[in-house]
Amino acid sequence: MRGGAEHEERAYVYMVRCAGGQLYTGWTNDPGARLHAHKTGKGAKATRAMGAQRFAYLERCADRSDALRREAALKKLPKPKKEALCAEWEGKNLPRLSVATRADAADILEIYNWYVLNHTATFQVTPSTLEEYEDWVDNTRKVAPLLLARDAEGKLLGYACAHRWHPREAYDWSVESTIYCAPDARGLGVGTLLYRALLEVLDVCGYWNVYALVADPNPASEHIHQRLGFSCVGRTPHTAYKWGWLGLSTWWLALRSGSEKPAPVRLTSPEETAAILKKYGSI
């Protein structure tokens, strides 16, 4: 999983649910970074005092001026109308987890190519083709199930998967995680939901180590990895050049420990995968 700076200008209006049930309204260019700021006490005074938890509402706007106008309108709404908006939004955006097939390649590619063109979360600079990604889906599913999160209307909110850490046989028990969320789904908890489900799948498969490569610096991504139990095991500056020099940090999570010879890894059965996904979202 990588994270980094965004190249495309975007604007959103949002409401954040706080610990006591209160709603805080604001606007932002980067939902994920803004929610992280609110949750870590670096956002508004109100959310520092009330304890921000999650987005209860998020709406993309045409530009900053439109977001400011929409923010002012939302702030004037009485609490019952705000709650009604949040309930409708949450009903539409509640993630439904499933396993990807080759037929999902186009939806996955749409998300990934957005990051290629607009973000340093990936160091790729040339968009991939559908043919490449259909093959990519097939190859990825040989390592572990490729997990999807969709909303109630079927829109892809994000995906999570694993790849071999190294092609040599002795590395068979180590994988690299990959997670991307749709631009409008960042900061909604979709990534964490997918990540937790993926880690449980990888554990059942018999993998020992999960690695993640993160564009450096990226406090929000690092916070997620720390919360999930990863440790940073290395940082290298000036690793890649995409709209400027970028560093890279390597994160590691041990799924099991010991010195005995490991059992061969295997794919989870459809029943095992379904049971795991049921814990994190409907399938």
Name these PLM-found stretches.
Residues 1-94:
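GIY-YIG nuclease catalytic motif and its immediate N-terminal context
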Residues 192, 216-234, 245:
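Conserved active-site alpha-helix within GNAT-family acetyltransferase domains
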Residues 202-214, 224:
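Conserved GNAT acetyl-CoA-binding A-motif
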Residues 238-283:
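C-terminal "cap" of GNAT-fold acetyltransferases
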Residues 17, 127-184, 195-196, 255-256:
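Acetyl-CoA-dependent GNAT
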Residues 96-108:
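A short beta-loop-alpha structural element at the N-terminal edge
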Residues 161-164, 211-214, 231-247:
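Conserved catalytic-core motifs of GNAT/GCN5-like acyltransferases
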Residues 109, 113-136:
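Conserved GNAT-fold acetyl-CoA-binding loop/helix
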